[in-house]
């Protein structure tokens, strides 16, 4: 808001002269001049451009004065271009309330640029205190930029010596030598050095204080007072702490206001509308914002102005009263932050006489103390090098705050932070003031630096850890550097060097991870997480970049990947350039659809960046603030490119690529902690798990990645491999598993805090976790279906939840109250030692832990000192971790922070969101999100040990959590954790102390006191690790002479007259003796109640951890199915259901039993099958059963058929058993001579003589049917092996012996061809076979074997004739061509067979050298008396004569005799063959059936052709038809599969008519070579 000015006149400051000692105002009217018309036009134009730049209460406009043109004039600081004249300005000469422009013109000076309308500043800039009521006719006062510039050009703030109720203004006449201080109430809270006060005391001695000072001081002054509380330690702000007295004004003094102390209090500035209130508020606001870095948002509510004018030193002579100093202190606060402005106008002396100063000049001795002291023995800050040093006189020429030499600004609310440069200090570790104190790990944060004084041409180098960047000088008090990119989080060294100087200005800069950094770019909806969003809307705070809202911005996209050992964060694309700084923008993904980022399309997540289009340049260094978003997936940008690269299912392809890559990486699941089963256990495991900021029930209950969850916890430190664990819990408090749903708990390959050395792949904080764990979750699950294969692989294989079956709750021990201790084994006792002691000590080669406590005496009560102590500080360290100390703050310093935390000796704070969790080497420290006042701190070590410190109402408790790996390893006041209370009182030397628990003195003297610490290392005890401040060592706290109260009950140690206290203790505490003891000792109800509360808390924790949760573990959810519930505790009944169009198979229900196991399943599996797949499985199962039943049955039938069909009739139709088949003709002759006749006799006994049949062989009967000889192929034996069908063992065979003895070559018989069987040929002339003697009788055989046989008969050979035919005339060669073919055959009618028999009137005897058909002819041994020859065999008695001639109707077909030995061998061979065929063919048939079934489903259109094909294949072949099957015949179904699995025939197969002359029926394949395929032989075959 503002007043529109149409005509503005330039205001010239009127030169005024103030006469010393007079209160009259002399107006100098001679210096007034008029303003030219050109000047008025120019000023009017300038005002029109800035007519809206008026300051309001809530949004003051920043104005940067030209501080480079400031000069000093008689102690006043003025702008050269705004002020003229050598005399002080007197604005009271101008009546600004007259609204008379013409009169103003007469009073204005030509050079002035100040524009004022309708305002009288005489009340502000004069000596009279103005009224605080409304001015300017009751309208709210509005300050202009010109007026603000004018009032800020003055060095000293306003103070008045006139006006007010008593007409003394701000002057404090009650302060003088006899009463050097005065009390003032604020009626508001003034934070100072950790404390907060609503009052102060103003001292004439150059300071204000808030607590009683000591009775006397010793110089040089030292604070805090080491002997506190025996000696008072004052809390004060010392601008010039030295004994003073009010001096006299010198004649040349330009300021006529009287010497002394001035005090003015301006309250509620934020709501004031009067002129003084508004101008005071705006002046202080901009002086602090521009003077102190990091205070850009400060807005004061109250100010205090204290001025010491013309103060002389105490102890001087009368003339020393004119040796005076003038200085001013301005305190501004919003009741959270407090700033102090020290204005040193004039310093002429430095020390008073008690400090050794000269009585005349105040020089020499110890100069004044300048600094701050918190009081109560806590902290102090001495402003070096000026305090108590000779360079104190330089205070008027140093500081340069707001461009004024002599102005020094400090921030003093919690810590003392210097806001101005310090030119005169030097050292190796000078404190560096910088803001902000933390920044995003990605870089780009502008860091303002204050500490050294800068010259415009200085070269500034800032080093962040190991990275150095160049800075730029802004002014003498400030330089800026841009934070580079980090690859780690936590605290980093921050150092500044000027020119060629070493890095001596040092500080610590906190690096925030991208996932936990303060969010600066916001996404109002979830569109950025989608694959194809229509738009992506972003917002940001427009004032985070610059206060100039007209500046142009640019938005860019960055991506991250890990394809090499080094992480890569790279620029991808510019989203938009020239964006207005409106705080919002909408991204249209369609604009980037045709982009081709070939080098970056493998980046799957990244960040949005917003910065200035045109960076500002300071000393050649471009400076532009940068805003980063949180990590976001880049599907909205790269989806079209990924679709072109991977297809429409790009998410599935990318998921598969990740799965393939992740399988090559090392498994990490065994390295992380096991999740607790319930949320209660997870919240009580302080050493291993901490809240997950992405799903926290207190601050972030949305749980984007864990829908249905209410709270998640994460492992507090990375594992030995750098991985982390996550455990999420549902509304019932049970662990959510990824086997049940994709929102379940998931471990991570990379921990969010990273892993040393951080700058390598898989070890970068936040970024590596997003790369390895978060983006795969998007690709496999969020961008696909939950039951997709990739998502289930992600959930079940790559990132599966660990069940809680093996979880073990930690052991807990604690200390609280006065103090009372509960050990790990639940032993309770009280120990009131005073000093520093060991609580827990573990000294193992792999596990090391030290937890120490400090006990200090309880504050006094109304009856005096209290002989009891309480816990005030705890320090802990583990292995190689940093040391963490948590200290109780003083009672009056707990208004903002209840506990102080020291990390490696430095204070750290958790007051901002990004600082809630801080990671240090080996240890993580965090403040729970629901805590805002730092009253609860949790320390987590990488070993799993945890320390929890809680404060309430000034009373502190500490609890230690240890995993089971520490069992039997602990020592100290918390005992030996062995589940046995008897060894808890173990001394450092390992001996057990005998302690009476009812006697506090016994535990104190015999056990606890042995664990006291000192500042030197002690064996089995260690060394004290506490932060030492102001020389307070362990000896300062240890008090072995302190004797506490050892009596347990208040009724026994309180005096009789305090029986009401005893009664009160019983009412408050009831059955808790710890509570009664604390109340009886301290009479503090808060302490007693919190003692009872802490005891209940640790008792409940122990009971909860001791409560074992029995878990049945993981029960997988079937794919395409669901479970009725996700519980896993005993008694849980889980029913399985399937999605629509799916059928459940297997177990439908499982029950968790009391033994922690799921009941035994009926089937062992549970599946949800599609209806089609279920039908296929049912069909396959049916076919499997059929095949399993039919195949053995068919095999059995085949075997039975073989036995029944080939076995001769039992009525005497069996042939001789030719057991030995010689290899050659010569061998046959040898066998005839050497075979035993006894063998023939045995054979004949087992044979049926055809001649003995009742029926005449002349006429065929049903018992002797005409049939073709079956297949009877004999395989030749292997070399050296004569065992086989017809071949006796080589070692036993007579033929073998004969062959060997005869010396004849052994001709290898081959049976792979077809042999003539002399079967009747079709259409051949009928031949009447003569009657023949079918075989020898048994008597004849017996006669042949009689001893009367002569030796000569050995040369004769007895043949075993064939059953149905006699061979006449020439003997027939046996051998390869004598083997019968595989099928019956006949010669063509009229063909001549040279081997065909000639039917004569009589039979011719068979020559002995010939072997008919099988050549199975034996030579039985013939007795020497026998002289019969083979030719006379059939003429022997008892043998019927052969018929004279054959019958007229001769037998056209005949049957070959079977051989029983051959039949047994053939049966075995056939059985083995069928077994092999079945074993091979059965799986092939099943596979072919499966393949055929699936092909049938895919190619239903070919079902008709398949049926036709099957019909053709099974019907008889028409001789007139010719079927040709080639590889190009498309009538064959499933041609594709056939060609893939079996080779196609090279030529067709034809059906040929038997009458065809080319049809070689009945003839052997004499022209075929081994291995050559034979022609088709009467059946339809497909080769």
Curated annotation (Swiss-Prot):
Subcellular location: Membrane; Cell junction, Septate junction; Lateral cell membrane
Paired cysteines (S-S): 1112-1152, 1138-1168
Domain AMOP: 647-798
A GO-annotated cellular component: lateral plasma membrane
Protein's UniProt keywords contain Disulfide bond: yes
Keywords: Cell junction, Cell membrane, Disulfide bond, Membrane, Phosphoprotein, Signal, Sushi, Transmembrane, Transmembrane helix
PROSITE patterns cross-referenced by the UniProt entry: AMOP (PS50856), NIDO (PS51220), SUSHI (PS50923), VWFD (PS51233)
Biased composition (Polar residues): 1232-1250, 1405-1416
Tissues showing expression: In fifth instar larvae, expressed in midgut epithelial cells (at protein level).
Membrane-spanning intervals of the chain: 1183-1203, 1473-1493
Extracellular side: 22-1182, 1494-1583
Membrane topology per record: Multi-pass membrane protein
VWFD domain residues: 811-1019
Residues on Cytoplasmic side: 1204-1472
Function per UniProt: May be required for the proper organization of smooth septate junctions and for the barrier function of the midgut epithelium.
Name recorded for this polypeptide: Protein mesh
